[in-house]
Amino acid sequence: MKFYSTVAVLCIAGSNLFAQDVYQLFKAEGFTQENLFTNNIEGPCFDRYGNLYVVNYQKDGTIGYVKPNGDVSLFLTLPEGSTANSIQFNSKREMLLADFTGHNILKVNMKSRKVSVFSHDAFNQPNDFCINSKDQLFVSDPNWKDNTGKLWRVDKRGKAKLLDGAMGTTNGIELSPDEKILYVNESVQRKVWAFDVDDRGNVSNKRLFTEFADYGLDGMKCDRDGNLYIARYDKGVIAVFSPDGKLIREIALNGKKCSNLVFGGLNGKLVFVTLQDKKGMERFRNDIPGKNW
């Protein structure tokens, strides 16, 4: 999903959100107020028009719309029994949600706001996902009780295929800018794995990308150069790794329980982070734009 001229117009209009040059490089600051979301705040995602959506606003089972000045309003309440943990948009501009309590991938019509089940398979707890240019989803599916997890691919028709059924607690997941490498982390095991991805979305050559001795791992995103940004849960930093697995820097946040992140702003150089201890969001200016810019 690339961002086009329409987004640029909207970005300029929302100066509080997009005037990124006023922010000190790598210096985190508050974006939304605290305690607007639940402690399950997660899954920040921009649509192609520059609108920001985040899960679990005010109560679990909701989607919040975050305005350019950091104010938040209710966009959608999900059907009873559903709680989203991640958001993506497909090429049809439909919102897709990882529903970890309903064990589904949900689809939202953005005009009618009608919610339907897009995929329902043997999911334990779909947690996070990323999407490629063919509208294929790659989904992490952890079992926190057993410290195990699975990796799925869901095609554009909603058909799921198990790619790896013998992983640790799968959580954060991201594709490289060229969509040839898939990164999947395991929160409890504190490992990040890399897979090669072929043109059909099959994975191979699983290898250890990096691992940590402490704290947790959560959401991940790539910048345009292929560097990987990892939310270090409980440590309160975003760890940035080069494509060859070398630590470039750690960006300190004010909150500790960082759950996910997304690139945004006029040039894609603002990074917005969800924090579960703050029940809100922070942001910082980056030197490289996100992979969609």
Model segments located where?
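Glycine/small-residue-rich hydrophobic helix-like segments
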Residues: 197-260
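Short loop/turn segments that connect beta-strands within beta-propeller blades
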Residues: 66-71, 109-113, 154-158, 196-201, ...
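A short helix->beta-strand "capping" segment at the edge of beta-propeller domains
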Residues: 20-38, 70, 206-207
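Bacterial Sec-dependent N-terminal signal peptides
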Residues: 1-22
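Beta-propeller fold detector
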Residues: 73-77, 116-120, 161-165, 204-210, ...
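A short loop-to-beta-strand structural motif that recurs across blades of beta-propeller domains
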Residues: 62-64, 104-106, 150-152, 191-193, ...
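Beta-rich, blade/repeat-based domains predominating
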Residues: 35-51, 79-99, 104, 121-150, ...
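Blade/loop signatures of beta-propeller domains
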Residues: 20-29, 57, 141, 150, ...
